[in-house]
Every structure is written in structure tokens, then in C-alpha cells.
């Protein structure tokens, strides 16, 4: 059964990775870059501090817990235990895959930390903000970042699915902590007040604009 699933994963990887061109090389290289999304992160931080200083600090601490949880489960626990080679280091297919800028990543790829971290971030703040539009756009963003890892040839689809599962787990665990302690007397019930819809729309707009700029810039590279 495991061998059958692995063979399907390999075939799907080769198929999906085969759809490439120079334009999308630039697009997905930037989408996969962690620094690319700094405008989104700064916007979310600004929204938090516009509402309530105590809640902002509380949520920033929890965001640290969120990313630490997602990243450590994926990179610190699962990868060293499973030892599944990335497609870029798998002898059967490494020479036929498409890569960008010679990047092949480390030896092991299950599960994808990119997928885990972006899904954790999107999931957690979707729960915190409670805004349908932001939820849809942020989840699509997380899926786009996740797909970029397949395009770049450094993760199997199975690595991505595993990362998505870790990200969802981290998001719900962190949100549970957020709700559990939000009524603590030191927080003065600050977490019970909903976020402004206009502020959340700004975050959604920044995310869309950030993504759009990537596609535009890539056309001139």
C-alpha cells in the first residue's frame, strides 16, 4: 500500500512539475520566498495594534508559538524521523525534474515546512479575524505557496499534504489556547471585541496586491 501511494506521488510529481516556463519560474521563485510576504505580516501586526495593545502582544506571542509549533513538528520531528528524500534528491527522478536557479533544498522533504507554516498562519488568523473574504483569500494564498514547492521541484505532493495537515493542527491548537486564555483578568476581556471589517479588508487587499505585483514584475524579468 505504501509503495503504491509512493509510486502515485512520484508520477503526480513528475506530471505537475512538467508544466513550467521562464515566466512562471520567476513567479513561483518569488512566491516561495519568505521575505516576499513581509508586507502581509506587517499589515497584520498593524491591525493587531490598532485594536488593543494587550491583545496585540498576546497574539504576537501566540503567532510565535504557532510558527514554532508548525515548524518544529515538520522540520524538527517528522523530517528526521521519516527521512523521506525530496524529489530533487530521489535518484529515480531527480535528473528529469525542472528546477529554478539551481535550488534543490536539503535532503529530506516530508513534510513541507512551507506548507505547514503558511497554512498555520492563514488558518489561525482566519479563525481570529472571523472574516469570510480574508479566510478564502488567505487559504488560496497558502495553497499557492504550497504549490510553488512542487513547481520548484523540491517537494512531492504528499509532502505538501502532510504539511497542510500539520498547519491545520497547529492553527487549531493555537486558536484553542487563544480562546482558552482570552478571558484572563490580565487581558481585561480585550479579546472578546471583534476586529474591524475595514482593517481586515486592508489585510486582504495587501495580500492580493502583493500577489499581483509578483505576477506583474515577473513579466519584466
Question: What does each model-found stretch correspond to?
Answer:
Residues 45-49, 70, 74-83, 126, ...:
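Membrane-water interface at transmembrane helix exits
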Residues 98-221:
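Membrane-embedded catalytic cores of phosphoryl/pyrophosphoryl-handling enzymes
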Residues 1-39, 74-104, 218-221:
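N-terminal transmembrane-helix/juxtamembrane module of multi-pass inner/ER membrane proteins
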Residues 31-48, 61, 114-117, 136-137:
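Hydrophobic alpha-helical transmembrane segments
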Residues 18-26, 51-60, 151-156, 194-195:
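Membrane-helix interfacial "entry" motifs
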Residues 45-73, 135-136:
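Interfacial segments of alpha-helical transmembrane regions
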Residues 35, 61-73, 77, 161, ...:
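Hydrophobic, lipid-facing residues on alpha-helical transmembrane segments of integral membrane proteins
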Residues 34-35, 51-54, 129-133:
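Transmembrane helix interruption/hinge and helix-loop junction motifs
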Amino acid at each position: 500500500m505504501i509503495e503504491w501511494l509512493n509510486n502515485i506521488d512520484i508520477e503526480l510529481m513528475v506530471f505537475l512539475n512538467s508544466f513550467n516556463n521562464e515566466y512562471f519560474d520567476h513567479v513561483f521563485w518569488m512566491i516561495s520566498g519568505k521575505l516576499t510576504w513581509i508586507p502581509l505580516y506587517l499589515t497584520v501586526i498593524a491591525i493587531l495594534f490598532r485594536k488593543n495593545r494587550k491583545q496585540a502582544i498576546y497574539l504576537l506571542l501566540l503567532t510565535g508559538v504557532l510558527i514554532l509549533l508548525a515548524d518544529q513538528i515538520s522540520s524538527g520531528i517528522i523530517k528526521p524521523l521519516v527521512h523521506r528524500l525530496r524529489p530533487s534528491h530521489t535518484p529515480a527522478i531527480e535528473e528529469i525534474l525542472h528546477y529554478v536557479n539551481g535550488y534543490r533544498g536539503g535532503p529530506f522533504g516530508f513534510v513541507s515546512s512551507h506548507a505547514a507554516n503558511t497554512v498555520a498562519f492563514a488558518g489561525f488568523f482566519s479563525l481570529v479575524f472571523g472574516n469570510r473574504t480574508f479566510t478564502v483569500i488567505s487559504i488560496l494564498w497558502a495553497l499557492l505557496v504550497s504549490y510553488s514547492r512542487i513547481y520548484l521541484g523540491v517537494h512531492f505532493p504528499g509532502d505538501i499534504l502532510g504539511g497542510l495537515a500539520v498547519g491545520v493542527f497547529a492553527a487549531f491548537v493555537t486558536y484553542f489556547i487563544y480562546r482558552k486564555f482570552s478571558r484572563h483578568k490580565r487581558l481585561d476581556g480585550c479579546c472578546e471585541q471583534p476586529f474591524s471589517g475595514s482593517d481586515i479588508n486592508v489585510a486582504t487587499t495587501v495580500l492580493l496586491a502583493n500577489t499581483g505585483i509578483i505576477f506583474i514584475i515577473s513579466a519584466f524579468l
